[in-house]
Amino acid sequence: MDVSYLLDSLNDKQREAVAAPRSNLLVLAGAGSCKTRVLVHRIAWLMSVENCSPYSIMAVTFTNKAAAEMRHRIGQLMGTSQGGMWVGTFHGLAHRLLRAHHMDANLPQDFQILDSEDQLRLLKRLIKAMNLDEKQWPPRQAMWYINSQKDEGLRPHHIQSYGNPVEQTWQKVYQAYQEACDRAGLVDFAELLLRAHELWLNKPHILQHYRERFTNILVDEFQDTNNIQYAWIRLLAGDTGKVMIVGDDDQSIYGWRGAQVENIQRFLNDFPGAETIRLEQNYRSTSNILSAANALIENNNGRLGKKLWTDGADGEPISLYCAFNELDEARFVVNRIKTWQDNGGALAECAILYRSNAQSRVLEEALLQASMPYRIYGGMRFFERQEIKDALSYLRLIANRNDDAAFERVVNTPTRGIGDRTLDVVRQTSRDRQLTLWQACRELLQEKALAGRAASALQRFMELIDALAQETADMPLHVQTDRVIKDSGLRTMYEQEKGEKGQTRIENLEELVTATRQFSYNEEDEDLMPLQAFLSHAALEAGEGQADTWQDAVQLMTLHSAKGLEFPQVFIVGMEEGMFPSQMSLDEGGRLEEERRLAYVGVTRAMQKLTLTYAETRRLYGKEVYHRPSRFIGELPEECVEEVRLRATVSRPVSHQRMGTPMVENDSGYKLGQRVRHAKFGEGTIVNMEGSGEHSRLQVAFQGQGIKWLVAAYARLESV
């Protein structure tokens, strides 16, 4: 049989994985190693050479897009029908299983799937029915708790509360939620997998049927599986099924949502004798970029081990730029992209990656000022985000009580006991009397036309808005914004959201405070008060709209969103301690290695050109913060990195000290060797200077604080 069409396009290790005997197999697939091709060719090999029926094959991926691509590529390669083969996501395959056996799974034939929004709405209703205070028992936290328990395979009766009243209450919420779903014939996404797992445990004859059918199981992105997903695959395989898993322990970056990188090691323990094949040849990046990625990830412990390499060129060194602040960082990135475009490159070939969504605001503004179209991948523009629109609506209502849209958005956000029935009365009164909603509330309260509890809640809300308006009227804009976010209850509400999403919302609110501070410094309008001017600015920016999907545009995204993508030119911004690695990872033990894996993912997105940037000072939470450069910069080989200077580019030893040619004369008014005092760092000596005018920078050796580069215009140094 001629199998050249299956093997000729592959390298040696890929061929080894595709043509391996039918046995349990771990393929450690490095970034850019064409693992999808290997999976597709392996499936084709099983059918063509091993004579396996498509009916015996189950292939599991993590996204519907990946599943569709796999089906398409198998069809192209084989040219025959793959009828009977199951290819899909964990949730999709579990859904298919439950539809086929709904009675055995104790589900109605027409059971419906709850999306996240529906799940949240149901939990809000249940928490209210249980007479629980939403502020103390937030529905979003309840959703996180329930989904986390299901991902661990736990029902309410499995949970050990050990007399903990908080745990007991969440357990009751979970129980009430489960009963409500069962009555209505509803399943959420986490329930799909848990119910499918329980189906096999409780109905051995059904499990045996699928074990006999799916004797060839292939799972992609195995490092991203959680406990219930692993248990599902382990149960299906039994003692006779042949499992091929493809994964990369160095790219496990979803621990915050339950992914267990340890599942790769569990596979080796549970399937003794499983062969391991490493795909290390990279078809994406230059040799310099791969050398940096290898050196970075080697600082993690407990790796299964692999080293990426390429037949391609060495390529350019990685560029490293130290910005004065986040504004300078954004300008530098935009200027680099403009140069790329001027040299014939497409904007869509450039990606800006950041650790936190909050970092996008300054970048978005710089791109807008440069009239450069951009697209937020997998997310929304800064001023379109829920928490930002909530905060802006409070500010709008303070500026104008008759803003009905703002009133509607925040009257019950956070929840304050103003029900839909009360709001319907307010709306009807507004329509009948041709009043704004605020005016309608005033009249209804004066007329005592509302029920006692509703009237009290509405009265408190209006008093809150009036008090905020009066007490913050003379405050600087950023102080006013910070006060409104706190006193409105928004900050507390979002702090109660568990996990990465809640943290992101808080960071975005803090970035809004920073935005108002910078606006009050940089924007002047004689005809408007600062708050009104900023609200106009925010509305105009939100109205700009993202670039159309067909339009050539710069790509902005978080590092998590970038996984699986590649771009000719990549910028990773905010490479500072406390930013990346994040402060949360530094505060919580055991998370630093996942941050390093995230950095590794970011570095390996770059095909030709990679630029890393960090800022000496950055406005965070409305304050100027000094961060050290990220430890990840110091872990890169010095021969792979080149530091970008204002006037020249020089090779850089990789350390947190900066090298340069001393300038004896400088128009900043400072001199080499001069003793100075800084408000935060204390006394020090000027050891180097560069730039001129507003870009003049000083390198100062501080006692006990190390060497710092400071912008002369902002440093406020005193001579000693």
Model-derived features: where do they sit?
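Structural signature of nuclease core domains in nucleic-acid processing machines
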Residues: 1, 240, 562-579, 584-585, ...
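Conserved helicase NTPase motor core
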Residues: 3, 8-19, 23-28, 38-39, ...
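Short glycine-/polar-rich loops that comprise or flank the Walker A/P-loop
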Residues: 23, 52-56, 81-84, 239-242, ...
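Residues at the beta-strand->loop junction immediately N-terminal to the Walker
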Residues: 28-30, 60, 322, 377
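Helicase P-loop NTPase motor core
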Residues: 31-39, 43, 272-275, 280-373, ...
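Walker A/P-loop NTP-binding motif
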Residues: 37-52, 73, 234
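Conserved P-loop NTPase-based nucleic-acid remodeling module centered on helicase motor cores
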Residues: 56-145, 150, 157-162, 321, ...
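Conserved helicase C-terminal RecA-like lobe
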Residues: 159, 163, 346, 360-372, ...
